């Protein structure tokens, strides 16, 4: 086997490793190595092994923590266990933001966990903002295929120059590709990683119909398996840059494998309950980064015919995969 052939084989294997597995093999860190308490006093408790932390919401206050460093791109992950029983109005967030540095034009990448009344399941919401574009909501909401209150499950965000990918238990559930027309709407400035629990009674559950009932407090969320793998930068630099070779490999990691993409499509068809890309009441012309999937559109129209009753003009139609091909894919 010649040198060029051996090199091409190595690069093929390396790309597969990075995109498929390496992100899940990144080292875990102790809480004090990467984070600082943000608020909450005694409502934040670090386990004596230093690897896990509890955030609590009670009548007095919520709680939260923030990364010690500020990052320009990276992979950020934690295994989280949510409060059980009645949790309406409770919001638990795992997100990137620079709102403290850029009050009028901040960026944000969100995982939000929205509590519910007894007998109804938690919901997950993902969202992104760039350059203060809060007037353009890019929310998606989902149910899960497991009970997130019974055990820990891993939630991860990959943020690169061109992609944002949200994962649940290593399954990609949402991919945002940067488009030229997005401009500053794509998060591009250095951000910190935050985790918080707080009272979102005004909006979190059925638009505020059900609020937090402190009779069931304290509400406790637990975090472990903490991963902070990114390019730490100095935000005071005029043009902060990321030159870390390991972080540059995020470009490769953002290439979703065929197996991962199949799992993502199945998840979205089974568990997605809202996407701004299909909300024709909100957007008459779909935003540029949206790729409309006919199967997703059909399911959402059945789920909520008023909101998703038609497909807006101007969308890009995704490649349609045959039903037989999806049937061969592992169920989620």
Curated annotation (Swiss-Prot):
Glycans are attached at residue 131. Residues 313-326 have a biased composition (Basic residues). The keyword ATP-binding does not apply. PROSITE patterns: GH16_2. GO terms for biological process: cell wall biogenesis; cell wall organization; fruit development; stamen filament development; xyloglucan metabolic process. Its EC number is 2.4.1.207. One of its GO terms (molecular function) is polysaccharide binding. Transmembrane segments: none annotated. Xyloglucan binds at residues 112, 125-127, 135-139, 202-203, 207, 282. It is found in: Secreted, Cell wall; Secreted, Extracellular space, Apoplast. Keywords: Apoplast, Cell wall, Cell wall biogenesis/degradation, Disulfide bond, Glycoprotein, Glycosidase, Hydrolase, Secreted, Signal, Transferase. It holds the Pfam family Glyco_hydro_16. It comes from the Eukaryota. It catalyses: breaks a beta-(1->4) bond in the backbone of a xyloglucan and transfers the xyloglucanyl segment on to O-4 of the non-reducing terminal glucose residue of an acceptor, which can be a xyloglucan or an oligosaccharide of xyloglucan. The active site is at residues 108, 112. Residues 1-22 form the signal peptide. Contains at least one intrachain disulfide bond essential for its enzymatic activity. The keyword Hydrolase applies. In contrast to group 1 and group 2 endotransglucosylase/hydrolase proteins, it may not contain the ligase activity, and may catalyze endohydrolysis xyloglucan polymers only. Belongs to the glycosyl hydrolase 16 family. XTH group 3 subfamily. Catalyzes xyloglucan endohydrolysis (XEH) and/or endotransglycosylation (XET). Cleaves and religates xyloglucan polymers, an essential constituent of the primary cell wall, and thereby participates in cell wall construction of growing tissues. This is Probable xyloglucan endotransglucosylase/hydrolase protein 28. It comes from Arabidopsis thaliana. The gene is XTH28.
């Amino acid at each position: 086997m010649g040198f060029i052939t051996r090199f091409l084989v190595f690069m093929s294997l390396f790309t597969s490793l990075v995109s498929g597995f390496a992100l899940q093999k990144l080292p875990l860190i102790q809480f004090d190595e990467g984070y600082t308490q943000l608020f909450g006093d005694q409502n934040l408790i670090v386990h004596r092994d230093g690897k896990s932390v509890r955030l609590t919401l009670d009548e007095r206050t919520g709680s939260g923590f923030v990364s010690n460093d500020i990052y320009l791109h990276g992979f950020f992950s934690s295994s989280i266990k949510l409060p059980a029983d009645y949790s309406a109005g409770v919001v638990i967030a795992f997100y990137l933001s620079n709102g403290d540095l850029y009050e009028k034009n901040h960026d944000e990448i969100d995982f939000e966990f929205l509590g519910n009344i007894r007998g109804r399941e938690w919901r997950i919401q993902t969202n992104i903002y760039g350059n203060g574009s809060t007037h353009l909501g890019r929310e998606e909401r989902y149910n899960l295929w497991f009970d997130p209150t019974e055990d820990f499950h891993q939630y991860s965000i990959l943020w690169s120059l061109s992609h944002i990918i949200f994962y649940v238990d290593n399954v990609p559930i949402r991919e945002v590709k940067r488009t030229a027309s997005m401009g500053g709407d794509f998060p591009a400035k250095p951000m910190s990683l935050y985790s918080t629990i707080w009272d979102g009674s005004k909006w979190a559950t059925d638009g505020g119909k059900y609020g937090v009932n402190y009779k069931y407090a304290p509400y406790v969320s637990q975090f472990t398996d903490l991963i902070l793998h990114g390019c730490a930068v100095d935000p005071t630099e005029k043009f902060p840059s990321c030159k870390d070779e390991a972080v540059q490999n995020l470009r490769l990691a953002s290439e979703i494998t065929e197996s991962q993409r199949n799992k993502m499509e199945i998840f979205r068809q089974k568990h997605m309950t809202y996407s701004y890309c299909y909300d024709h009441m909100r957007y008459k012309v779909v935003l540029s980064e949206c790729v409309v999937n006919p199967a997703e559109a059909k399911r959402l129209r059945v789920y909520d015919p008023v909101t998703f009753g038609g497909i807006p003009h101007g969308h890009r139609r995704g490649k349609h995969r045959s039903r037989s091909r999806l049937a061969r894919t592992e169920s989620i």
